[in-house]
Amino acid sequence: MISTQHPNPDRLMRWATYASVATAMLLILTKIIAWFLTDSVSIMATLIDSSLDMLASIVNLVAVSHALQPADSEHRFGHGKAEALAGMGQSMFIAGSAGILLLQAVERMINPKEAMAGIDVGLGVMIFSMLATMLLVGFQSYVIKHTDSTAIKADRLHYKTDLWVNGSVIIALILTFYNFSYFDPIVALGISIFILVSAWEIIRESIDLLMDHELPDEERKKIKKVILKTPRTQGCHDLRTRRSGNMIFIQFHLELDATLSLLEAHSIADGVEQELKSLFSNVEVIIHEDPVTL
């Protein structure tokens, strides 16, 4: 995804991490109360999920702060891969929580409990959780639109999943109140599957970043289109792209008329570079000029 320009994308990313941690802390406190009053395994599932979300969000906060540091003499390409490392750490937290939930859900299916007390409080807490999560996801989506941050996308993935999870728990609480006791652990099983899917998505994207995976074909096509539409360019080859944090790196060979002077060729290459910088919010471009005979 190509992010749109914003006057201060770094500040947006920091605010997104602060908002994520604050929201997770608020949800944990409210869910502890709801679980204590209802003894619902579904609410316990969301409590564990929110607790791990907070740990992951704290990891994100630290990683984003490090990733936004400027390049130095020992890290010439910046610190952007700290985001991918954070994503790998998050996936471990998430996969672990899925295992805990599976065990708890199976135990509750073997030993079901009667209708729980405090259902009204539990419902109120889960509805509040959905509203708070919707606000956070909306803000994270805005930040991603302007930064395309992998760490923020991973965090948003948690909370988008939580919206489905919280909705399922609300249904489970209502049905359990009417003595459909098996529905509560069934929802917990479904939640664990959602969590595992989320972990896989984060792992896949993190590995792509760490292994310098090429940008998607759609973005590579847009890059080539920008290059070829620039006046006096004859073509390009050996296009290589990668992403590190919120930085994009592009390098390619630019084919130019062999009769051009060095100054003219350099001026054309500069024009291509500026066009690419207007397409991406954070990009570093390396161009090798190749002479071709017309």
Map each language-model feature to its residues.
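Peripheral (non-transmembrane) domains and long loops of multi-pass membrane proteins
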Residues: M1-T17, E74, H79-A82, S198-L294
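Alpha-helical transmembrane cores and adjacent cytosolic helix/loop segments
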Residues: M1-R220
